[in-house]
Regions:
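Cytoplasmic helix-loop-helix junction between adjacent transmembrane helices
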Residues: 100-141, 147
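Helix-loop-helix hairpin linking two adjacent transmembrane segments in secondary transporters
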Residues: 138-176
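C-terminal transmembrane bundle of multi-pass solute transporters/carriers
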Residues: 5, 52-64, 68-84, 95, ...
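Loop-to-transmembrane helix entry/capping segments in MFS-fold secondary transporters
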Residues: 37-38, 125-135, 245-246, 333-342
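Glycine/proline-centered helix-kink
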Residues: 23, 139-151, 231, 263, ...
Length: 402
């Protein structure tokens, strides 16, 4: 098996396991363990907290240990977590289910950060856009399918079968990772500072690098806006738009279609368009999408909302693949884990703030005001790119040296 093929198979298995676990947790907690909304909220929060708690230390270890070994650790953790979750459901221990959720999500965090850091050593620089697109396509497809599969299992068998499928996905991913070449640690023992110092070095590199700083700020504003949109979507759809729950879900599902088509189109865009076009298009088309949501209450609510969700899937997926490639090229290999962890921590840290802001503004000033906030944040994400050197990036940068 070729190294990239092994990594692609591992990506499909890992994201399938992660998305099945995400979809299965609330079903298991509610239908099997009888958890109420308060306890369910704690379980979902625990699962989501892994990105904030684990990313920065994991990024440092990714730069210290052979990356294949880190992938094995991550997948073994995910596999164990799925098995423990089944045991928790069978015995009725909610705390054990929460611990399994944290462990499984932590394994996903380590896997994602490691795979992004490992990819530049497996493919030529010119193949990075296509390779990143294929990895993102695998993630998008399983993310779209997992909730439906989990729901069918819960309806016809038992919610815990979702964890069995998650364990199978993690096991298949582990088999693929074992086919990767051994590799060596990016940094040697004599070069290793303390954990805190190593994390600060990664943060400082992101702040000092003009391209990485622009990417990070754009992602922060965009994620703030998107999670504000998610927070107000149900009251917007069921209220001013007049949608029933089925049409509400159908409109939102176009987001997944946008992700998949964006991942499919990304290699062609990388060949035909200079990077700055894609980097501006992604956040700019999100402003257009926000305008569609603003106009939706005046008529054709379903069509406008569906088009809006499609655009915030399609354009930002193109942007994500392009910026990931730029990030991989400008970051030296010994810093790759910490740089990726810094960016991801900032993104996941701002998401709950966006959701909170969207909900508060909608409650205090109304849904139109919340939509204006969302439009403004998407516009800021575009402005950050336009004012940064990313807007002048006509070719991909040369790979950084260690």
């Amino acid at each position: 098996m070729k190294p990239f093929t092994a990594l692609l198979g591992a990506a499909a298995g890992t994201h399938a396991a992660d998305q099945m676990a995400l979809a299965t947790l609330p079903l298991t907690a509610t239908l099997v363990l009888g958890a109420g909304p308060d306890l369910l909220g704690l379980l979902v929060a625990a699962q989501s907290a892994a990105w904030l708690l684990v990313s920065l230390p994991a990024g440092t270890w990714i730069d210290r240990m052979p990356r294949r070994r880190m992938l094995i650790v991550a997948l073994a953790l995910g596999l164990t977590a799925s098995i423990v979750a089944v045991a928790a459901a069978a015995t009725g221990y909610v705390v054990l289910l929460g611990l399994a959720a944290i462990a499984g999500a932590s394994g996903t965090v380590v896997y994602v950060l490691t795979s992004v850091s490992l990819l530049p050593s497996l493919v030529a620089p010119g193949d990075l856009p296509r390779s990143n697109a294929r990895l993102e396509l695998a993630r998008a497809v399983v993310s779209l399918a997992a909730p439906f599969v989990a729901g069918l299992l819960a309806q016809h068998l038992s919610p815990t079968w979702g964890y069995a499928l998650a364990a199978l996905g993690a096991a298949l991913a582990l088999v693929c990772v074992l086919a990767l070449p051994e590799g060596t640690a990016p940094t040697r023992g004599a070069e290793r500072p303390t954990l805190a110092s190593a994390i600060r070095v990664g943060m400082a590199f992101v702040v000092r690098n003009d391209l990485l700083r622009g990417i990070s700020l754009c992602a922060i504003f965009w994620n703030f806006a998107f999670f504000a949109l998610l927070a107000i979507w149900a009251p917007l759809a069921l209220g001013p738009l007049g949608l029933d729950p089925a049409h509400m879900g159908l409109a939102q599902s176009t987001y997944g279609a946008g992700l998949i088509l964006g991942a499919l189109a990304a290699p062609l865009c990388a060949r035909r368009l200079p990077p700055f076009v894609t980097l501006i298009f992604g956040p700019a088309v999100s402003v257009v999408a926000a305008s569609l949501f603003l106009a939706a209450p005046s008529g054709n609510g379903f069509a406008l909302a569906a088009a809006g969700y499609f655009l915030v899937g399609f354009g930002p997926m193109l942007w994500l693949i392009c910026q990931t490639t730029v990030r991989q090229l400008v970051t030296p290999s010994p810093l790759m884990g910490r740089v990726n962890a810094t960016v991801q921590t900032a993104i996941y840290g701002v998401r709950p703030l966006g959701a909170l802001a969207g909900g508060l503004v909608a409650a205090q000033a109304g849904l139109p005001a919340a939509l204006m906030l969302i439009t403004g944040a998407f516009a800021l994400s575009t402005l950050v790119i336009v004012l940064s050197p990313l807007a002048r990036l006509r070719v991909l940068p040369a790979p950084a040296t260690a």
